[in-house]
Amino acid sequence: MTNALLLTTGAPTPMPADDKQVKGISPFDMSAVSHVEELGPVGAGEPMEPYDASPALRIRHWNELVGVIRAFLVEAQLPDTIGLPDLVDYLTVKSRNPAVGQHITTPVNLTAWLFMIVRALQPRIVVESGVFKGSSLFTMRCASPRHKMFAFDVDFSWLTHRFDAVDYRERDWGLDDVRAEGPTDLCYFNDHVNNCLRIRQAYERGFKHLVLDDTPDLGEIRAYRYPAVPTVSMIVSGKFQDGDAVDWVWQGQRLRYTFRSEHTFGARELIDHCHPIPALRRWTGLQDSNAYYVKLK
């Protein structure tokens, strides 16, 4: 009976302590023979990445990741100029980034995408709205140090690092007049403000390339107190109609969002094409995001 229960429930039936000692049963007996070697405890303060690998395997793994990045750039009609040296550069920048991986900063895998998109576009101007501790700001500044960079937030007191070559503006992006100077200039919005409003504002200021974070669809919205609704995913899917409501629970609080077409500012008609930013956790072991790359007309 015990073996049958193990196979159907996936967990061993509790046994008296003395029976366990006699039969030598442990919770891991169903794993049969383990090929994982124990190397001992981690030292106090020892930095640990999600994994390490032998050098040859690491290079093969990185090359596989570069292939994923390049495939997305092709799909998004961006310059396909990224190679292994760019990934190595990103990893070096990531290791120096004082805010990377901190609580509620830009997900680490999205910082990788921002680095690669900036490298591919080589913009004259990069705008970030919603800086917080500066993880993504640090990443994009280091991706292409030649571009002008504008950082917008209503409070810069959380910043972990300041660059002399960044123009910090402590106000809402919507109240400013910074404009694109070239066709490859980029805006990154991580401010939890209506995606559609930001698209309209960027379009009116001449920007063609956008990355927008916090763009959940129905199955992802429960992770947010302040999703940037209506989000890109909501307007491009075509399934939302006026009055459609979404309810969810966030940290014990019931929330509701009701879709209204007047809140979209005609953003769908301004988009040439857009693409959800792919997940990279399989390769990095780190956090992904609900973000979109958007190309405007």
Language model regions located:
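A short alpha-helical cap/connector motif
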Residues: 1-186, 193-297
